[in-house]
Amino acid sequence: MSMKDNIITIDGPSASGKGSLARNIAAHLNFDILDSGLLYRVYAYLYDCGLEHSKIVSHIKKDIFFKTDLNGLTIQDGKEDITGDLRSEKTAKAASKISSLKETRSNLLELQRGFYSSKGLVADGRDMGTVVFPNAKLKIFLIASPEVRAKRRYLELQNRGQEVNMLALIDDIKQRDLKDQTRVLSPLIPAEDSVVIDSSEMSLDEVLSFTKKLTKRKLNK
């Protein structure tokens, strides 16, 4: 893969703010966006519905539709809206588990790379800068303390009307971190040429402002 001047990768642990940053930077630059975590959730959802590994990617290409409007992003399996199922903690845990399998990661690799277009791409996930787009021009590794990330997730789930326990969220995040960082395939580590941003004491606006300066310097955009 050649050096891509218009690919930005944003990696980091669960609830570090990758998605919010990716959406804002993509809108700022008018780039396409790849939410790889959402793809893994779709994969896990379809697997739990009984589809075999060998059939999931073709099903995603043919029957999964991503729609964005004033109300945000919705995902449909055919005509069925599965957005709520994908955003649940149950699917999040299933995605975390299935993402450690070689077959899953291999199946999704080319699908993820297929999101690239000459328009430009912001890709967020856990191995975007190390595995999927290793030659991206700008790589960001976004982190925050488990406590800060748990608070963000707590507020997010509360806004969806879900009952959550803060201590349980902190423990869950720490366990996911350990699993992501120690897995054999595509462990959660910053790329050697990535810029590490600790957002523990930063607002989204502050992280966004800093990232815009990086894009100006690295991509001249």
What is the role of each PLM region?
Residues 37, 79, 108, 122, ...:
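Residue-level signal for inorganic ion chemistry
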Residues 67-72, 76, 105, 112-118, ...:
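Small-molecule kinase domains that catalyze NTP-dependent phosphoryl transfer to phosphate-bearing small molecules
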